Amino acid sequence: NAGAPQHLCGSHLVDALYLVCGPSGFFYNPKGIVEQCCHKPCSIFDLQNYCN
């Protein structure tokens, strides 16, 4: 289930951002997104907040 919140860390997190944001890219704010998506599970909608 792609919409289910999950823990994403390191390269998995970067890969997910590329998939979610596509050609527009994303701004990588390690502190914010690691706190939100690695330490706690996050959803695709959370990832979209980091797209440009």
Swiss-Prot record:
Biological function: Insulin decreases blood glucose concentration. It increases cell permeability to monosaccharides, amino acids and fatty acids. It accelerates glycolysis, the pentose phosphate cycle, and glycogen synthesis in liver.
Give the UniProt entry's GO cellular component terms: extracellular space
Keywords, A to Z, come to: Carbohydrate metabolism, Disulfide bond, Glucose metabolism, Hormone, Secreted
The top of its lineage is: Eukaryota, Metazoa, Chordata, Craniata, Vertebrata
Q: Where in the cell is it found?
A: Secreted
Choose any GO biological process term that the UniProt entry carries and state it: glucose metabolic process
UniProt xrefs under PANTHER family: INSULIN (PTHR11454:SF9), INSULIN/INSULIN GROWTH FACTOR (PTHR11454)
Record-annotated disulphide pairs: C9-C38, C21-C51, C37-C42
Q: What SMART domains does the annotation carry?
A: IlGF
Q: Which domain of life is it from?
A: Eukaryota
What protein name applies here? Insulin
The record's similarity note reads: Belongs to the insulin family.
* Record InterPro entries: Insulin (IPR004825), Insulin-like (IPR016179), Insulin-like_sf (IPR036438), Insulin_CS (IPR022353), Insulin_family (IPR022352)
Q: Which SUPFAM superfamilies match?
A: Insulin-like
Self-association state and partner proteins as the record states = Heterodimer of a B chain and an A chain linked by two disulfide bonds.
UniProt GO molecular function = hormone activity
Q: Which organism is it from?
A: Piaractus mesopotamicus
Recorded hits in Gene3D superfamilies, A to Z, give: Insulin-like
